[in-house]
């Protein structure tokens, strides 16, 4: 059970990281490398901090993932990562600042992903290393 808890923490952190980076990058205009100046950092400090928080979230997620892999067989652990796709989709539809639309096709695809994860992890119990 400990492996699933670490896996869930990894999934939640990677979902948060993805949302933070999307929001932060949407606030910064597209530019070339030559446009990067100190003034740019001063003007867009908040989005840059948010993107940095997203990168830190990815690092924490990876740490949790290492612990999940320690406790779960790979064929059980790896599908858990797919849950983050569903969570990102759901959050992007619900949270107003992402302005994502829900469509039948996207929702069905997300449900298929979740069904696949459930199917793989609901099979007969196998002993997991402690």
Curated annotation (Swiss-Prot):
<keyword id="KW-0997">Cell inner membrane</keyword>
<feature type="topological domain" description="Periplasmic">
    <location>
        <begin position="26"/>
        <end position="47"/>
    </location>
</feature>
<dbReference type="InterPro" id="IPR022832">
    <property type="entry name" value="Flippase_ArnF"/>
</dbReference>
<keyword id="KW-1003">Cell membrane</keyword>
<keyword id="KW-0444">Lipid biosynthesis</keyword>
<keyword id="KW-0443">Lipid metabolism</keyword>
<comment type="function">
    <text>Translocates 4-amino-4-deoxy-L-arabinose-phosphoundecaprenol (alpha-L-Ara4N-phosphoundecaprenol) from the cytoplasmic to the periplasmic side of the inner membrane.</text>
</comment>
<keyword id="KW-0812">Transmembrane</keyword>
<feature type="transmembrane region" description="Helical">
    <location>
        <begin position="5"/>
        <end position="25"/>
    </location>
</feature>
<keyword id="KW-0448">Lipopolysaccharide biosynthesis</keyword>
<feature type="transmembrane region" description="Helical">
    <location>
        <begin position="100"/>
        <end position="120"/>
    </location>
</feature>
<feature type="topological domain" description="Cytoplasmic">
    <location>
        <begin position="121"/>
        <end position="130"/>
    </location>
</feature>
<feature type="topological domain" description="Periplasmic">
    <location>
        <position position="99"/>
    </location>
</feature>
<protein>
    <recommendedName>
        <fullName>Probable 4-amino-4-deoxy-L-arabinose-phosphoundecaprenol flippase subunit ArnF</fullName>
    </recommendedName>
</protein>
<keyword id="KW-1133">Transmembrane helix</keyword>
<feature type="transmembrane region" description="Helical">
    <location>
        <begin position="48"/>
        <end position="68"/>
    </location>
</feature>
<dbReference type="InterPro" id="IPR000390">
    <property type="entry name" value="Small_drug/metabolite_transptr"/>
</dbReference>
<keyword id="KW-0441">Lipid A biosynthesis</keyword>
<feature type="topological domain" description="Cytoplasmic">
    <location>
        <begin position="69"/>
        <end position="77"/>
    </location>
</feature>
<dbReference type="GO" id="GO:1901505">
    <property type="term" value="F:carbohydrate derivative transmembrane transporter activity"/>
</dbReference>
<feature type="transmembrane region" description="Helical">
    <location>
        <begin position="78"/>
        <end position="98"/>
    </location>
</feature>
<comment type="pathway">
    <text>Bacterial outer membrane biogenesis; lipopolysaccharide biosynthesis.</text>
</comment>
<feature type="topological domain" description="Cytoplasmic">
    <location>
        <begin position="1"/>
        <end position="4"/>
    </location>
</feature>
<keyword id="KW-0472">Membrane</keyword>
<dbReference type="GO" id="GO:0009245">
    <property type="term" value="P:lipid A biosynthetic process"/>
</dbReference>
<dbReference type="GO" id="GO:0005886">
    <property type="term" value="C:plasma membrane"/>
</dbReference>
<keyword id="KW-0813">Transport</keyword>
<dbReference type="GO" id="GO:0009103">
    <property type="term" value="P:lipopolysaccharide biosynthetic process"/>
</dbReference>
<comment type="similarity">
    <text>Belongs to the ArnF family.</text>
</comment>
<comment type="subunit">
    <text>Heterodimer of ArnE and ArnF.</text>
</comment>
